[in-house]
Every structure is written in C-alpha cells, then in structure tokens.
Amino acid sequence: MRLEALAVALPEVTGHPNRVPFEGVLTLVDEPSNRPPSGARGHRVILTREAALAALPSLMGMAVDYAPGWDGHDARRKCGIITRADVEANRLRVSGYLFGKDFPEVEDRMRSGKAGMMGMSYEIADAHVEDMNAEIWKLTRATFTGAAILLREKAAYRNTSFQLAAKHCREFASRRAPADRPRRLNERNIFQPEKGKEARWK
C-alpha cells in the first residue's frame, strides 16, 4: 500500500464554533467513473494516480461547497476548507473543516442524514485529456479548484464519501448546551463571486 499526503497546519482552538472537522473520499484514482461528470461531454473519466499526486498541492486550502438540493456544485456556497489530502491505494481522501457557525444547515444535514448517504465531487481546471477521441477520458494533468458535498448517488463516483469526523461527533454530544442557553447573533456572510470558468465535475 502506497501513501502520499499533504496537509496545512492550523493552530488548534478548542471548541471553535466555526470549525467542524470533516473527512471524506473525494474520488478514486486509476479507476473509471461510474457515470460521466458534468463538463466531460458525456465521457466517463479516469484520474490517473500520477495526475492526482501532482495536483495534491493545489487541493490545499481549497473550499468545499454545496447546492441546496445536494445534487451538484455551487462555487458561491463555500461552506468549508480542505486542510489535508492523501492518496492511499486507489482513494483520494481529504479532511478539513466546515464553517459550522456560518452554515448551520450543512452541519445539521450531516448529523441528521443516514450514514453513507453523502459523497463528494472534485472541481478542476486546466485538465489535460490523453485522447479526446477515447470512450473514457484519461486525465493526465489537472488543477484542483475545490470540491462539492452532494448525495453519493449523484456523484460520478459511487464510492466517494463525506462525514463529520468521529472525534468531533463525540465532543459535540458531550458538550451540547442546555435548551435555555442564550443564542448569539449570527454574523452575516459576504461572498465574493468566483471569476473565470472552471470544470466542476461530479
């Protein structure tokens, strides 16, 4: 088993309300997708291991986003950040933080949904296809620009996953506030629309 990993070190802040740890499988390498990703012109795709490893640095610090129906991408709904990525066997795994205070609906969805229901989908730019005439496109180079959280059944790869980190789930259960605890006013989020076009593939 080969393992390649990269991580961005962030200082620990115990009980930070806007850092909700997550983990997931973003995609599989050296395996064809189960369905064509959007932007692939009806072709299934293979992300080569070499391309995935070369692109790992571009994944650090990228955002995770979601669409209200949990069925696609919306780059303007950036609800978290990726701080670690590794390729183990054929899985590209990621972890990071959801912005739980800013996007409580995302955290609520993760807690209330069935286990194994959610998946992930990468977003890329500057993708190079080995043979555009091939039935299955082989990606030999790409730059990661983000990732989406969506229903696993909607993802191009059925074996992706997304869940809150187990440690956080245990801590959350042990420190739940009483129902009569005063609530703080939420701060308003301000989004800056992305410029340029990217290939956001499921």
Stretches found by the model and what they are:
Residues 1-22, 133-135, 163-202:
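Intrinsically disordered, low-complexity terminal tails
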Residues 83-174:
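Residue microenvironments linked to proteolytic maturation
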Residues 17, 64, 73, 85, ...:
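Intrinsic-disorder/low-complexity regions
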Residues 36-49, 55-63, 105-125:
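Extended Gly/Ser/Thr-rich low-complexity repeat segments
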Residues 26-37, 54, 70-74, 101-107, ...:
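Short, surface-exposed beta-strand/loop "edge" segments at domain boundaries and coil↔beta transitions
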Residues 54-92, 96:
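A broadly used, surface-exposed interaction patch
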Residues 6-13, 76-87, 128:
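Short amphipathic beta-strand and strand-loop transition segments with alternating hydrophobic
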Residues 1-59, 175:
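Polar/acidic, low-complexity leader/linker segments enriched in S/T/G and N/D
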